Amino acid sequence: KKGKNNTKLHLSTFVLSLAYALVCRVKAEEVKSKRVVLGVSVDYRRWLEPLLPPTYFGNCVGGKAVTVETRELLGEEGVIVVVEALSEALETLNEDGVLNGVENWSSMLFDGLIPDDKIIGAAGSPRFEVYSSDFGWGRPKKVEMVSIDRTATFSLSDSKNGDGVEV
């Protein structure tokens, strides 16, 4: 499928769950800011040029920010607006590479934000399979991301039985 800007839509569990949760949160909090900035963590390993060797053990996580007008989020097609914005952001990773403009990141971060912007983050992924972890005392019965309780961040993970997403 293609979005309004002819962007190929990225219809993953992560994108759809995050879009729905963001719209619900903005409505529930009755956000008054003109814009909402959604910050997402991105695993950069697959986008690096040259590619990392298969023996690489570690991570390479960066961020991607998506800015959406609050009035569009509150509209009838709010979820679609977020899906299109996230899809477009992911497409720029494919087209431009993850390190494009790295020398300007800090100034873009601090100069690009408007004080009135509502900033919300997203952490985790349903692909991490947190309920499959076993450190020797059995699989977890409940997983909670406690480190984000004081920030405006969502946590997404797979559900305990693997057939859904916990937000």
What are these regions (language model features)?
Residues 1-167:
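Acyl-CoA-dependent O-acyltransferases
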